[in-house]
Amino acid sequence: MLMLSILLPMLLGFVVLLKGEFKSRNTLLTITGAGLAATAALAMGVVLSGETELALFSFGKNLDIYFHVDTMGKLFAVVVNAVWVLAGVYAFEYMKHEQEETRFFGFYLVVHGTLNGLVFAGGMVTYYLFYELMSLLSVPLILHNRSKEAIKGGLKYLFYSLFGAYLVLFGIFFLNRFADSLAFLPGGTLDPAAVAGNEKLMLVVAFSMILGFSVKAGMFPLHAWLPTAHPVAPAPASAVMSGIIVKMGVLGMIRSVYYLVGADFIRGTWVQTVWMSLALLTVFMGSMLAYREKVMKKRLAYSTVSQASYILFGLSLLQPAAMTGALLHVVFHAVIKACLFLSAGTIIYKTHKTMVADLRGIGKEMPIAIWCYTFASAALIGIPPASGFISKWYLATGALASGIEVFSWLGPVVLLTSALLTAGYLLPITVNGFLPGADYDDSALEKKEPNLTMLIPLLILAALAVVLGLLPGSLTEYITGIVAGVL
């Protein structure tokens, strides 16, 4: 079942790509829909079946292709498969106005398989293999329309990804020398005897891993691909790039720090200080850039730069409450940002408007879609009782409880400032959308609500953004258990 959740969508995707154009669009959508549903069902079967191990190949000391389903992997598996399927269903309608649907859905299926390979990876070699596959195979989702801007965005994403991959590979090379194993074990696998006398080198190795994975996570100074790639990609691709693929960089950091190097090894060192500093800088910088941005999808891309670093700041504190907040924000941000990008896609699909200034009265034209956008915005800002409030509360209390000089108070201040900026760049679309002013001419107003294929995923995501905040108990309890195992 585990291997099927990885191989089935990849094989189906390659079959779709090799087939080329389908005579019937319904055939393409049936294959894609069945593939997405079956893959998600298989992944959920793995999640519910308890811990599973599967060793495939070994190429030498610690160089194993190995899968292990642990509590962390299960959390990410649920998020990945839920959001990927919902965005895929939305794409059935959205991609009508794009050319070469077959290519999009083929790669969409293939990347789904690589993501399951990532969340179920049992060691860093396996993780790196699927991480590279994901990076390469997701490029066509960005440069789909082959415009000059799309090609630029896709190549920028690729080059940044390759640079990050080299940094991670550097780290793996040295970890293989100084670790008992490259398998993911809570607390880390470093061999104290081998590390003795090489502590400075190992700190560089740890930082190399963090920086390498920060490319996907969008942390400064390696964030620039995000605002270039998102505006040119189709909306479903933007939704999963921001909601899911960015999180694979986050998961890579978690596996590196908490399951290989060990949190205690970098605690109180320059690595932790630089990591916290870059994360906080990115939180503020991303919010400011989003606030100033006039293009709707680019504004949401800068928002992802900021919000993903909320997660990274929580992880960098190496503190239980902060890590709980970080993992909660992984879940909440995936849902919220997918909803926001799909809302933006709905506006573009129905009106062809991309600039924020052109959205006056949009709430009167498509009220359901804009209410979905509004609920997701409230959650991202952190307005109680929506989900974002819960994760940000844990992040702030974790920072205060950490006792780390400067960061224990600077962190909450930056998070609060960012929340205010988030309100400043998200809510005007709602306000101007529903209250366009007395000079707005609605005499020729035409309802432009999308059909159910687009609306149902939007409604589900918007509902989750609120319900997960109203009923956070089970999720928080599960995440607290994960954190207790690594800190």
Language model features with spans:
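Transmembrane helix-loop-helix hairpins at membrane boundaries of multipass inner-membrane proteins
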Residues: 1-4, 11-106, 186-189, 479-486
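Select subsegments of transmembrane alpha-helices in polytopic membrane proteins
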Residues: 2, 240-249, 451-455, 459
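C-terminal TM-helix exit segments that contain a strictly Trp-centered aromatic cap at the helix terminus
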Residues: 38-50, 170-176, 250, 380-384, ...
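Hydrophobic transmembrane alpha-helices and their helix-loop junctions in integral membrane proteins
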Residues: 86-96, 102, 112-127, 137-432
